[in-house]
């Protein structure tokens, strides 16, 4: 059996490792001219780290990332709404990692090249067309100037090519642009003095704007960390996104400044942190409505191509990794490739659709919104505003939906 993987992001590369581990041949085609370590920080949750541990990547990730120790939810005045340990410190058998997105992709890319060979990943290859027949699927690839560069044939084709997936567009030709909720997201990372434990994550704000801050790598000195931050705030009424959503549009600091003025985070000088950041990026916060199906014949979708979701709850990359494991297992177990794709879809589509809808409601960060709605001017006693059991239901309920509650995660 052979799989054609369209997209060399985290989901596509992990899929290649999963398939190789199970003895299934595969090729990865990426439209960018090179797989560069771009982006800013992300969190990778224990259920996904357990899968990467099974692939033998834990030591490499540990060297590149921060083991997240704790998470705080604060209101816009910096008052504590919720606090919980994370990863190993919460009793999981594997860590939660905060890491630079590009570094995570780089670790996985290096493993693919080492195990499958340099020819397993072809860059500068845009999918032009694919066609299925009774015996397999054929795909044609072109460079950015439109010249044909490759034709390949396999038993299945996996679209892991992101929110602007060309594979998804071929399967669902009249879907239209992604859904924008009217929120803009600004992100950046810079070296900064360590705060709290040096492994802490803070989410603060209210209904109109929120900010997240956490370290993603060691700094030049023990008391400094490469620190990731993100601010999300309303910029419109929603609908079609104002510009193409990607990770490479420079942010405008003057648009961010009024929103930052709303925050008071006791442990971090937010304005100074952002001012010290050499480059910042912005994009409209978008997702897509869940599809009724991902697979048609020998072709299926994975990761953001299948279920793009708002970046709350630290779930985007983690869910792509879970997709990869499920798809690889299905291809091994099923008697026919199409049966495998249907089994994969039946397992993963309902779960990810639920997360997409949960993220639209704010995900676990909805606990901040719930408290602000009840106490917009702050509080003297959080339990008098929203009892512990109700706050726990919001946060833990999301963990259950997303599959990373402690009892759900089984480490290798």
Annotate each language-model stretch with its function.
Residues 1-3, 20, 47-172, 176-189, ...:
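Conserved N-terminal helical subregion
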Residues 33-51:
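Conserved N-terminal glycine-rich FAD pyrophosphate-binding loop of Rossmann-like flavoproteins
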Residues 64, 120, 262-279, 337-342, ...:
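Acidic/histidine metal-binding catalytic segments
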Residues 1, 21, 78, 292, ...:
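C-terminal helical "tail/cap" subdomain of flavin- and related membrane-associated enzymes
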Residues 184-216, 245:
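Flavin-dependent oxidoreductases
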Residues 2, 25, 226-228:
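Residues at the starts of beta-strands that form the adenosine-phosphate
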Residues 195, 215-220, 224-225, 233-313, ...:
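FAD/FMN-dependent oxidoreductases across multiple families
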